Amino acid sequence: MTETAPAIEAILAEYGELEQRLADPELHADPAAAKKVGRRFAQISPIVSTYHKLEAARGDLEAARELAADDASFAAEVDELTTKVADLDDRLTDLLAPRDPHDADDIVLEVKSGEGGEESALFAADLARMYIRYAERHGWTVTMLGETTSDLGGYKDATLSIAGKGDSADGVWSRLKFEGGVHRVQRVPVTESQGRVHTSAAGVLVYPEPDEVEQVQIDESDLRIDVYRSSGKGGQGVNTTDSAVRITHLPTGIVVTCQNERSQLQNKARAMQVLAARLQALAEEQASADASADRASQIRTVDRSERIRTYNYPENRIADHRINYKSHNLDQVLDGDLDPLFDALAAADKQARLQNT
């Protein structure tokens, strides 16, 4: 505990300051500032709670030891409390370890079809639905920012915004950040008349979304903004105005589109959110060689050989190749039951970080 003492003292002081700020009505007149303070408060609350539990357990242990000195029947309680103190101390040390600074963030998620033509586009749509259902299970909000559909209703590409339901240290990014990469599917395509199993792939990109676009420096002169005719809500062709927006960031070549909002202004605002997320990720890549390697490994090309996960329909099996994870509940996974897999990925990531410290 001596190593964590300075850190916990700083956290306790910050906790008290945040508590006072949250009680100030003036803070809530600025929703953005209130959200930022609330999120930080939620991030450090588990640390403070664990610290208080640890201090209480230490007090109980000291008292039990004094009683055990006169009465041997208290020896068992001393053993139990010794274990409890050790567990809480380990928990506190873990909570104080550096975290991914984006864990509390919302995300922008892109799904792109790859090799496999129509079958790949259909699989990309299956992946998008899987993430949407997972988000629904957690009470998160999903907004479809734009999509390009294939002839059979698949997605050539689709961009989603997924937002959490409140301030939490474990936000959307903390759960979905490992999804970037190439996803491979093995199944009999609907276009296959001979019943043969085919292999195709789709790619996923995930970006933490900044709280505000203003957090990312974007020069208006670096943007080319095009407007074009949107198909309207539900693809019924009811929108006859040029409301869809395509923004090209000229220095990087990044292109984002948004067509699902009701007005050109709303589509532009959404597209700017996506652009800010992608530029933030790019800046962090360039600032850190490790981050660059991580991001590059998400998806170089949507190629069947560069895969992070395989979805095998004939065997109802899912396999994540990064951690040798396998399960035979593909149908449930595609329905959004992803937490066991995400827990395994988070545990592997934590172990890797501990080995690198």
Curated annotation (Swiss-Prot):
Its main location: cytoplasm. Keywords: Cytoplasm, Methylation, Protein biosynthesis. It is found in: Cytoplasm. The keyword Cytoplasm applies. Disulfide bonds: none annotated. GO terms for cellular component: cytoplasm. InterPro entries: PCRF (IPR005139), Pep_chain_release_fac_I (IPR000352), Pep_chain_release_fac_I_sf (IPR045853), Prokaryotic/Mito_RF (IPR050057), RF-1 (IPR004373). Pfam families: PCRF, RF-1. It comes from the Bacteria. Methylated by PrmC. Methylation increases the termination efficiency of RF1. One of its GO terms (molecular function) is translation release factor activity, codon specific. The modification N5-methylglutamine is found at Q236. NCBIfam families: prfA, PRK00591.1. Belongs to the prokaryotic/mitochondrial release factor family. Peptide chain release factor 1 directs the termination of translation in response to the peptide chain termination codons UAG and UAA. This is Peptide chain release factor 1.
